[in-house]
Every structure is written in C-alpha cells, then in structure tokens.
C-alpha cells in the first residue's frame, strides 16, 4: 500500500488521436487523488523521453491514463 507522501505521476496525452480524451481522464484522476491527499504530478506522455521524464519527476507510482 502506498502512503500519502508517495509521488504519483499521472501519465496522459501523447501522440495518439485520443490525446485530448486522455488529458481529460488524467486531469480527473489527478484531481481525485489530490482531493484525498496524495502527491500528484500530472505528466504529458512523450514517447521519446518517458523514462527520463519519470526519473526527473521522482515518480514512485505511475498511473497510466493513456488512450488509443
């Protein structure tokens, strides 16, 4: 189980034609997690730099909100 201090990245968007739907989903997930006290980092999916970006953010948990 994760605690409230765990850094949760919500991964959304990206190059898909469903990117906007993904952003809407990701934003709703991030809001819900924040409303119950979790540390959330919304992140736009960049397929060329995803690992690097997750490391820079200090992600401990990744919630994947990608569509398409």
Residue ranges of each PLM-predicted region?
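ATP-binding N-terminal substructure of ATP-dependent carboxylate-amine bond-forming enzymes
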Residues: 1-68
């Amino acid at each position: 189980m994760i605690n409230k201090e765990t850094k949760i990245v919500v991964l959304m968007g990206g190059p898909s034609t469903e990117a906007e739907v993904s952003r809407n989903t990701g934003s709703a997930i991030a809001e819900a997690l924040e409303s119950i006290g979790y540390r959330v980092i919304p992140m736009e999916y960049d397929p060329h730099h995803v690992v690097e970006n997750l490391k820079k953010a200090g992600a401990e948990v990744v919630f994947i909100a990608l569509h398409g």
